[in-house]
Regions:
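Anaerobic metallocofactor- and corrinoid-dependent redox/one-carbon enzyme cores
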Residues: 1-25, 33, 38-258
Length: 258
């Protein structure tokens, strides 16, 4: 049902500073009790290796399978780690990767297009999802500039290029992590709100299933009112999904969210 009129979904984000599976499971249960997690249950891992990723995926799908929950899991490690884990038998849901609007920017993330091609092929063969859309991308204004990979273009133009790349792979979901770049590129709450609405608009124009991580870093000129205001604006504008984090405070990524 994600993306249909009147549906506002959420990614459940049960991160833990130690990748402790008991903590992750407890956060999953809490989030589900609020109806959060219909877009994806996605963990940002501390340790990016196949064994840890498989352990966390097993935890996520242990809950999904026990209660027959109509959602999908994801561990947001590097795309190559996810591919290897799934090929070794880990339960596959969505395959994730952060993307950038230039080849140089992708290389800064350690990514080549061939990896995304392989991820789509592996997802089509192994992933436990109902449809064909098996990829999950994250973006955000300023990433290309911070990597010196914008070639003189402004951050909105570079962000628009992200959505063109994402559309090529027909992903299940895409979201901007709008304030995570910090005040060096989006200084305060007004700039973050503007960027969130810009990204939503560009994503929708690109025809992709667009969401937004309404967030800010602790050194930005912003507070939790920003996240709530942007969340309401995006819901009114038809955004597909946002994030769900315990108390809006991600203890692993060290930023403030919804």
């Amino acid at each position: 049902t994600i993306g249909i009129p009147g549906t506002f979904s959420a990614r459940l984000q049960p991160n833990d500073t130690r990748d402790d599976v008991q903590s992750i499971a407890a956060q999953i249960y809490e989030g589900l009790s609020f109806g959060v997690g219909d877009a994806v249950i996605g963990v940002n891992p501390v340790t990016d290796d196949v064994e840890n990723l498989s352990r966390v995926l097993d935890t996520i799908y242990g809950v999904i399978d026990k209660f027959n929950i109509p959602t999908q899991g994801c561990v947001l490690a590097h795309v190559t780690t996810q591919i290897e884990a799934i090929r070794r038998g880990a339960p596959g849901g969505l395959i994730f990767q952060s993307i950038c609007g230039s080849e140089k920017g992708l290389k800064e993330f350690g990514v080549e297009l061939a990896m995304l091609d392989e991820a789509r092929a592996v997802g089509a063969e192994f992933n436990r999802i109902a449809g064909e859309n098996c990829l999950y991308f994250e973006t955000g204004q300023g990433s290309a500039l911070s990597a010196g990979a914008n070639f003189g273009a402004d951050q909105v133009t570079m962000e628009a290029r992200n959505y063109g790349l994402a559309r090529h792979y027909d992903p299940f979901i895409v979201n901007t992590v709008v304030g995570f770049i910090g005040p060096e590129y989006l200084y305060n709450d007004r700039q973050i709100i503007r960027a969130g609405l810009e990204d939503h608009f560009m994503g929708k124009l690109s025809g992709i299933s667009m969401g937004c991580d309404c967030c800010y870093t602790n050194h930005a000129d912003a507070d939790q009112n920003l996240n709530e205001n942007l969340m309401i604006l995006l819901a009114t504008a038809g955004c597909n999904y946002i994030m769900g984090v315990p108390q809006g405070d991600d203890c692993m990524l060290m930023y403030q969210c919804t």
